[in-house]
């Protein structure tokens, strides 16, 4: 499964971004879609998980759709202090906030980062959109952020609970922000989810297998031929068809 970008972005541009998007917003969503297509779609993950991850990103980044650093960079928290061994500070980074050294190291193990890719030793790598997307998907599926809450608990064959799913990231679903016109955080994200799910479903396209692509390509070939007609006085007319090289 792949997603037609024109269809997807046309949908969310209207429903979520007031008719216009900045390039960083497009780039952030592109990173999320690309990570899904490359790493997760082959595993048969539920598209509702993708839609909820996009909705969470929309909320957590204040619609910027780019990985962000935790406000205050962990000031007053143990994880806001520089680690003596690595020289890194493990405050929150990403589309959703990855915090604490143990979690940065866990991301390295789970996602098989090595060398200069390692988040434990290069914490700002968590701000790269492709890395942030993979951390978000793995963390939300495996309950890294608020155990035991994960995608599968809220989106499965019998359940679709985008309101309750806020528990995956934060227990603030009942809180009503001053700017929200009386709508709770859980219901705000539920609304974003519904719009992202529409865009995801509208843009989903089955990707052809390589042999099917070759077959279609061969059917579309135009074959040029050379026709030679030989006419003799007493014999039959003969026609020789020779395909051009």
Feature roles, as predicted:
Residues 57-60, 150-177:
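Acidic helix/loop microenvironments that form the catalytic cleft of cell-wall polysaccharide enzymes
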């Amino acid at each position: 499964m792949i997603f037609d970008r024109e269809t997807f972005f046309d949908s969310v541009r209207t429903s979520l971004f007031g008719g216009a998007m900045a390039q960083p917003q497009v780039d952030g969503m592109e990173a999320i879609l690309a990570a899904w297509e490359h790493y997760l779609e082959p595993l048969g993950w539920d598209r509702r998980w993708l839609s909820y991850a996009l909705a969470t990103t929309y909320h957590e980044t204040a619609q910027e759709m780019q990985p962000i650093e935790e406000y205050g960079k962990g000031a007053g928290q143990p994880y806001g202090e520089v680690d003596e061994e690595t020289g890194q500070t493990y405050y929150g980074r990403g589309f959703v906030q990855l915090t604490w050294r143990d979690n940065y190291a866990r991301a390295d193990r789970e996602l098989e980062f090595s060398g200069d890719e390692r988040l434990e030793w290069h914490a700002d790598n968590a701000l790269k959109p492709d890395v942030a997307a993979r951390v978000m998907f793995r963390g939300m599926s495996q309950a890294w952020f608020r155990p035991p809450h994960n995608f599968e608990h809220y989106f499965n064959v019998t359940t679709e609970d985008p309101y309750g799913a806020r528990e995956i990231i934060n227990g603030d679903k009942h809180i009503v922000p001053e700017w929200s016109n009386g709508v709770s955080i859980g219901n705000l994200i539920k609304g974003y989810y519904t719009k992202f799910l529409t865009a995801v479903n509208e843009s989903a396209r089955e990707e052809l297998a390589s042999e099917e692509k070759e077959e279609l390509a061969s059917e579309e070939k135009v074959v040029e031929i050379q026709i030679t007609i030989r006419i003799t006085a007493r014999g039959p007319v003969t026609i020789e068809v020779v395909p051009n090289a």
